[in-house]
Amino acid sequence: MSTWSMMNLQDANSPMMEQLIFFHDHTLMILLLITITIIYIISSIIMNNLTNKFIMQNQTIEIIWTIIPMIILIYMAIPSLKILYLNDEINNPLMTIKSIGHQWYWSYEYSDFKNIDFNSFMINSKNLNHFRLLDVDNRMIIPMNNQIRMLINSADVIHSWTVPSLGVKIDSVPGRINQTLMMINRPGIYFGQCSEICGMNHSFMPIVIESTSNNNFISWLKSL
């Protein structure tokens, strides 16, 4: 969960988020090297007293500054495309959960075991036993270390179902069902928010996912 003055990304709690953090660091290192190189070139131009000011063209230099950026872009594109296709790949999920966005709350449907559906509203901020503007009355509970297919839809306007620590951000569009695969590595409680401005109470649409063991998940299903 993000905290005040936090500069880093949230800890990865899913394989997808681990890949996204790796890509972020990979790209950041390339940008750092480019920045250092440009600073060196500008400094050398300033400090060399315009030694080469009469050079009008140089084919070798033109080839170099054309090929090197191409190589850099390819080096950045390969991991990006890998993550892009992994994000769309869904292979034999354990279960399917449907999340429907409303103004201004979420509802969830579990239809694989028995027909379970419930609404998830933000808890009043006056209740000091919960995180302000983040906790809900009914959490989405899933088993850890299992592939879960999420179907995202909207009943009114465009929303966005987003959980940063899991690397999940799916648009919730009326009349359209988007899907993604999600797997959580460890037990815990993970917080998210609607990330699409959807009206007056847009900032009061928290998402809370509780990851637990298979046995606890089955016990929860039986209790409903």
From Swiss-Prot:
The chain crosses the membrane at residues 27-48, 63-82. Residues 49-62 are mitochondrial matrix. One of its GO terms (cellular component) is mitochondrial inner membrane. One of its GO terms (molecular function) is cytochrome-c oxidase activity. It catalyses: 4 Fe(II)-[cytochrome c] + O2 + 8 H(+)(in) = 4 Fe(III)-[cytochrome c] + 2 H2O + 4 H(+)(out). Cu cation A2 binds at residues 194, 196, 198, 202. Keywords: Copper, Electron transport, Magnesium, Membrane, Metal-binding, Mitochondrion, Mitochondrion inner membrane, Respiratory chain, Translocase, Transmembrane, Transmembrane helix, Transport. Residues 1-26, 83-224 are mitochondrial intermembrane. It is a multi-pass membrane protein. Its EC number is 7.1.1.9. It is an enzyme of class 7 (translocase). Binds a dinuclear copper A center per subunit. The keyword Electron transport applies. Its cofactor is Cu cation. It is found in: Mitochondrion inner membrane. Cu cation A1 binds at residues 159, 194, 198, 205. Component of the cytochrome c oxidase (complex IV, CIV), a multisubunit enzyme composed of a catalytic core of 3 subunits and several supernumerary subunits. The complex exists as a monomer or a dimer and forms supercomplexes (SCs) in the inner mitochondrial membrane with ubiquinol-cytochrome c oxidoreductase (cytochrome b-c1 complex, complex III, CIII). Component of the cytochrome c oxidase, the last enzyme in the mitochondrial electron transport chain which drives oxidative phosphorylation. The respiratory chain contains 3 multisubunit complexes succinate dehydrogenase (complex II, CII), ubiquinol-cytochrome c oxidoreductase (cytochrome b-c1 complex, complex III, CIII) and cytochrome c oxidase (complex IV, CIV), that cooperate to transfer electrons derived from NADH and succinate to molecular oxygen, creating an electrochemical gradient over the inner membrane that drives transmembrane transport and the ATP synthase. Belongs to the cytochrome c oxidase subunit 2 family. This is Cytochrome c oxidase subunit 2. The gene is COII.
